[in-house]
Amino acid sequence: MLIPHDQLESDTLTRLIEDFVTRDGTDNGDETPLDTRVARVRRALDRGEAVIVFDADSQQCQLALKRDVPREWLD
């Protein structure tokens, strides 16, 4: 299930994005400041390039590129 990012509280969205950009394996030695990485993800969400996916089984949200999400989830 996709969660519209504009339906989340601003603080909740920020925490979700911060969790994503600070995970092991996502920085690849990137020294870009956290605020910059968060802003990049927000722009991707605003442009529709990224989406928030909710997994009912694990009760967790994940960020994903829209192109990587099954087409049937986008309908």
Swiss-Prot record:
A Pfam family: UPF0270
UniProt record similarity statement: Belongs to the UPF0270 family.
NCBIfam families from the UniProt entry: PRK00304.1
Protein name: UPF0270 protein PST_1436
Organism of origin: Stutzerimonas stutzeri (strain A1501) (Pseudomonas stutzeri)
